[in-house]
Structures are given as C-alpha cells and as structure tokens.
Amino acid sequence: SFGSCSPNPRRDAPLLAVRVLGIESSCDETSASVVEGDGASATLRSLAILSQDVHAIFGGVVPEIASRAHLTAIAPVARQAIADAGIAQDAIDAVAVTNAPGLVGALLVGVAFAKGLAATLGVPLIGVHHMEGHLFATELEDAAAAPPFTALLVSGGHTLLLDVPEWGTYRMLGATRDDAAGEAFDKVAKLLGLPYPGGRHVEAMAATGNPRRHRFARPMLNAGQRPGDDDYYDLSFSGLKTGVLHAVRDAEARGTIDAERPDIARGFQDALIDTL
C-alpha cells in the first residue's frame, strides 16, 4: 500500500550534488528525466515524454499495446533525456524507476530497462512508488512545498487525501471507494461520445454548458457525517457516473442529446470538483 513506502533519507544532511535519471512507464506514457539535487533542493535538468496515441481508437488504455509501445520507446526516451540535460551517460549517479502501482507489463518494461542501465553504469537503482513521485514533484515546482502538509492526489487511477507530516511518512485520510476522479472523467467522456483521454474534452465541452440544467448529486457529502468517522474523507464517483448515464439516455429518448451534451458535461464536472 502507499502508506508502507520506505522512508526517504533525511533532508537535513549535507550532500554533494547528484544526478539521477528517472524512468516512468506505469501506464501509457514513456518518460525519462534527469534531476540534479543535493538533498536540500533539486532541479529538473531535462524531461522527455512520449505519449501513446494508439489507445484513442479503443477509448482506453490496452495493457498489451502499452507494454509493446514502452519496449520500443524506452531506450530512445532515456537517451533523449540524458542528451537534453547536456551530460554524458556516465555522469549519471543513480537510476530511479517507477515500480508500483500501474499496469504490470508496462512497469516490468521500465524496471527491466532501469535495472540493466544501472548495472551497466555501476550505479544504484532506486524504486519509486508512483504516488510518492507525484508528491515529490511538487518541490520541483515550488521549493517551499515541503512537509508538513495535506495532499490531495488526483490521477487517472487514484484519488487520495493524505496527511504528510514528513517525507516518507504518510497517513491515509480518505480515498475513493470505486472509480478514481480521472477514471470517471474518461468514462463520462465515452458516454458523451468524446475522444480518449477524456478529461480535457469534457472540460472544453463543459465550458459552454448550463450549470443549472443537470445538477448531479455530490457523492459521500452526507449531512450525517462527522469528523472522526471512518468514511468522513472518503469519496465515491461510481454513482455520479451512473447519474450521467441516465441523463444521457433520457436526453437520447427525448431527441435532445446533441443540445444537452454540454449541460451534462458541466453538471458532471461541477459535481466532481465540488466533491473534491
């Protein structure tokens, strides 16, 4: 589980600057970057990303296709990241790689490549939990984004609310009981006949929608809940998705679906964001 990640080294000990090549292949994007840091601060030296557009025709990620695409892309993407950082390959001090969670086959491609590269260079290999990577990325944007803080992690497959007293220590406050927020966006996009990945398309359509035409229930926001209840911070989006399905079917039966799509998109987006 996310809460069982191993603690990271103390941040207050002085360290020499090191360069780490990071590799990510947990889903449908192959990416690599070089990060340079001294334990107190870090700088993103490069970032190379290759998205897999092939999944659009299927309306979602096909694991086998994702794994094969990673096999083709991972070496060129890593080389590009090193070149963009303006360093030689032997200047890499460590290799970090996403090792969970994600699509098993996709993860295996990244981990196998990272293991081979680390062994070739004779440098340490560091496994990184995908969700912990999201947390640490905030410091690359804002050096002041250091614990203690409360974190809301919203990604394609996860929606988590965490208490972060220090790096490496995480307490789960709440999580989705079913669909993640990103997953709900993709599924609703499909119901509305929009391309994959659906988030940006739902957002664009919702921008022209009437917020009062379709007001969907805000899941898990019950008046009877009190702080301290086990489910106080939990989320649920499957019911919201079902509400959208019924709204689409009703509009189709009335023959007004084309006119109502933006209103349905707006109602869904408002409900999900209000819930978060």
In which residue ranges do the predicted regions lie?
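Short beta-strand scaffold segments in enzyme catalytic cores
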Residues: 30-36, 151-153, 159-163
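Conserved phosphate-binding catalytic cores of ATP/NTP-utilizing and phosphoryl-transfer enzymes
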Residues: 16-17, 128-150
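Phosphate/ATP-binding catalytic cores across multiple sugar-kinase/actin-like superfamilies
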Residues: 76-84, 267-276
